[in-house]
């Protein structure tokens, strides 16, 4: 019986995206095992035989030593075509893994959450019982590492305040967009997907729930509005109305055809992806909140 043991590194969004190409991997192997820092993502996918947390080799060493097992530790970010922005991350992964895929309608597959994680189902129900059945989900920050605990001069802990976070990016534009969404859809609650150290916004509900809960909530969400971030991957193919705001990255490399994509205008963007050349010189002109809102109101997927 053929089997493979795949290591998937990187952040939450990248790991969720990998589930999109697991059907092709499952055609090649009878059993598919995954090692990941987000192993719960892969336990939630029916194409995975089992998944293990990274760094706990005792859990999968017998599988790795099996003569019928292929060890697959491939990194799509190092793929030459991807670095040169000549293909989607799907295609880069497939090329590195030696499999063929059809990327036209790929979306993440998390079809076993209800079976594997009953607590997530209960939490999703609690959220809907609290905010109601009419809601919109938003995310405007990529995941940042939590800041270190703060102390005063005497060593006493200082309560965290997200307004102290140093890198503000386009946070003020996010509040402006939220205000526009709230004005256009006054009967809908706005659920804000963010880490504790990321900004909070007025007229939103910031939840403290496992990320898989958002995949379940997306099934009933009226709309999702987000940047190129982990939420995009958690909801694509589940929520029928997703607007994704793109900065220097592009939907033809990281996105999904089922979504509405609005891209920043790059005055200069000559650098390859994930270059060892320091900060990008790209001058990114983000769309205005008003421009994004026009896309949010549209109903058809595509690039705007």
Predicted features, each with a name:
Residues 1-304:
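Catalytic machinery of carbohydrate-active enzymes
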